[in-house]
């Protein structure tokens, strides 16, 4: 049977997982914090247990337009279930109970972005699709810079010669310094509104125990900023921004080098950078990240349709009215 847990109990269970699964963005406290970006999102923490084994799914529930249906989807970044057992039979039993919970709870459909570093598709029995490749820098037992390409090392050198310095700031600066700098950078890029966040979001992030803020500056001018999460073994790059002058001085190159150096000192195994803005192999963002490492991890998405008839009827209705986004599983969002 699936149980809905409170945040404290869910986080306590999460802390019992193997270190490789305890990534910050899969934690219940992150999922709860992320829900502050949209008042329509409700964080839910669902658990299946058998003796000493558990399956835990921290996700967001939202209403489907003006219908009586709800959907489930990952927090910003990644999501999907995690479990203390790798037994496929246990996962199958958990999934059967989860499907029943979805049906009885009025869930129409679910969409998840599975974490490349967790490999948690093994705990998800819905439809799984490959999306794109992502990049991570190895840290354990090696100098991180050994994985850098010549062009990346050259950029780091240019930043250092230009007088750029990288420094860690107190978490409170995630709400004090980061938002305005980030917003200006996103406006300059004409970024999708999906990547814009209210003040409450940064307030919530600043209170997470695993969060750290890196600032690169030259003199008094901020050139780059990045939010990173420290998990049990893996650092995750979450959000960042660079000004025009920062790009000219290669400040973001120095930012990732400094984060990797700190991770190595802390005994972390990986610095996860993510992938490109889409699945294109020639993505400029992927090209930048690929300069830091040749280690690749596949990003996969997962979904399930709980009520196919209702799903298809709504889809047809929105297609007829020109309101359906057919590139999305949750075509109404």
Residue ranges of predicted features:
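A conserved beta-strand-loop-helix scaffold within acyl/acetyltransferase catalytic domains
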Residues: 1-66, 114-248
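A short, internal acetyl-CoA/4′-phosphopantetheine-binding micro-motif in the GNAT/acyltransferase core
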Residues: 77-89, 140-142, 240-249, 277
């Amino acid at each position: 049977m699936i149980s809905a847990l409170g945040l404290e109990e869910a986080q306590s269970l999460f802390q019992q997982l193997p270190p490789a699964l305890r990534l910050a963005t899969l934690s219940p406290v992150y999922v709860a914090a992320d829900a502050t970006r949209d008042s329509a999102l409700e964080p839910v923490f669902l658990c299946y247990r058998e003796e000493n084994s558990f399956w835990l799914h921290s996700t967001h529930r939202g209403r489907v337009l003006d219908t009586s249906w709800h959907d489930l989807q990952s927090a910003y970044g990644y999501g999907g279930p995690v479990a203390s057992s790798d037994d496929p039979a246990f996962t199958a039993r958990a999934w059967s109970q989860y499907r029943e919970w979805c049906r009885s709870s009025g869930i129409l459909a679910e969409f998840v972005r599975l974490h490349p570093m967790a490999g948690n598709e093994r705990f998800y029995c819905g439809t799984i699709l490959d999306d794109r490749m992502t990049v991570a820098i190895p840290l354990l037992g090696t100098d991180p810079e050994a994985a850098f390409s010549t062009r990346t090392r050259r950029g780091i050198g240019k930043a250092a010669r230009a007088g750029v310095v990288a420094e860690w700031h107190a978490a409170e600066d995630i709400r004090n310094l980061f938002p305005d700098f980030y917003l200006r950078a996103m406006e300059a890029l004409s970024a999708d509104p999906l990547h814009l966040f209210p003040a409450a979001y940064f307030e919530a992030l600043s209170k997470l125990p695993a969060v750290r803020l890196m600032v690169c500056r030259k003199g008094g001018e901020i050139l780059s900023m990045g939010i990173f999460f420290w998990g049990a073994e893996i650092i995750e790059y979450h959000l960042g921004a660079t000004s025009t002058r920062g790009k000219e001085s290669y400040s973001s190159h120095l930012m990732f080098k400094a984060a990797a150096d700190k991770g190595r000192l802390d005994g972390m195994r990986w610095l996860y950078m993510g992938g490109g803005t889409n699945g294109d192999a020639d993505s400029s963002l992927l090209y930048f990240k690929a300069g830091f490492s040749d280690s690749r991890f596949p990003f996969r998405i997962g979904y399930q349709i709980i009520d196919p008839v209702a799903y298809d009827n709504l889809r047809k209705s929105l297609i007829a009215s020109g309101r359906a986004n057919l590139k999305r599983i949750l075509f109404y969002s």
